[in-house]
Structures are given as C-alpha cells and as structure tokens.
C-alpha cells in the first residue's frame, strides 16, 4: 500500500525486497545457529557488542538493564525518546576456563546519568571511543563521540572528541581503524 502511495520510494522497495529475501533465507538456512546468550542477555535493550583484550576474552556492550545490586532507590534517568532507562556500558569477562561471567557495569567515570553506547578500542586497548547522548532540556539533544583512556585497571572520565565545531551535529557509533589513523562514525 505504501508503494502505491509513494511510487519509487526506496524505503518501500527495500522493505518488500527484505520480506521476499527473508522467505528465501528461511528455506536455505546456513550452518550457523544464532541463539540467545543466557549468561548475559536480559529482557532489556542491548546492542553494540565489542570484543576486547589480547585474547578477546572480554565483551563490552550497551544495555538499558538495571545494574546488578542496584536497588529500586537507584537514581535512574529515562530516555525522553524511548521511555526506557538510559543505556550504560557493561563488561563481561571470560574466566580461565573460557566460561563467560555475569555482566558488570562500567565505572561511573564512563557511565553517567545519560546514554552511553557502542564502544570501540584502540589497538593497544588503552583508548575507548564511545557514543554519548546528553539530554539537556535547555539545549540540543544530540549524540557525540567521547574518548576515555585506561589507567591501571580503570577507564577514566570521558571527554568529547573535537570532530565538528557546532554542537548540533549528531555523531555516534565510532569505530577506530586498527592503525588508529581513522575514526569511522
């Protein structure tokens, strides 16, 4: 119906093509099985997984989950757009036997009362680039790329990456190149 109302709409065309392709994919499945990671998936929104560490034995991701151990009295700011709890960054580690452990929330220096998500790490693992979305009712609501550096075993307070001069351009979902010369977003 939408394509009839908007002939030539690329969105409508892509939607139809996606539905047609999905039925073909179901008829010809791959050998890969996608399943829920019961150890650390929750019923809340979770996205932006990024492996970390020399052995890739750590996984960072964003989630709207309430951190373990946080009582109902914990101050939680909800997102004005989604109505859900704001996203924070979480970390999951593998133990010496390769078993994934329960997720833990990152330090307060990175996680704030606003949205954080989609981390990317420098090759040496000492710099993290991530999306930060403040919700200033008096100012623009936009996403920015923040940078945090690791000292000892903790991430430091994130600082805004100076990429554009204005404060209303939305920047997010950073990915640093392996050589550290390029930041894709």
Feature roles, as predicted:
Residues 3-185:
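Short, conserved micro-motifs composed of acidic
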């Amino acid at each position: 119906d939408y394509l009839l109302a908007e002939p030539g709409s690329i969105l409508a065309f892509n939607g139809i093509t996606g539905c047609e392709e999905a039925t073909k994919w179901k008829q010809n499945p791959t050998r890969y099985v996608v399943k829920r990671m019961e150890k650390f998936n929750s019923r809340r929104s979770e996205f932006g997984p990024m492996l970390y560490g020399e052995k890739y034995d750590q996984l960072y991701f964003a989630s709207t989950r309430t951190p373990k151990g946080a009582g109902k009295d914990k101050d939680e700011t909800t997102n004005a757009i989604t109505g859900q709890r704001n996203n924070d960054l979480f970390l999951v580690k593998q133990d010496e036997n390769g078993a994934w452990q329960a997720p833990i929330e990152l330090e307060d220096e990175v996680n704030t009362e606003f949205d954080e998500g989609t981390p990317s790490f420098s090759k040496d693992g000492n710099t993290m680039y991530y999306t930060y979305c403040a919700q200033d009712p008096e100012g623009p609501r936009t996403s920015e790329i923040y940078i945090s550096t690791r000292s000892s075993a903790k991430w430091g307070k994130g600082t805004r990456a100076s990429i554009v001069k204005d404060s209303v351009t939305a920047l997010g979902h950073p990915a640093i190149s392996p050589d550290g010369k390029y930041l894709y977003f």
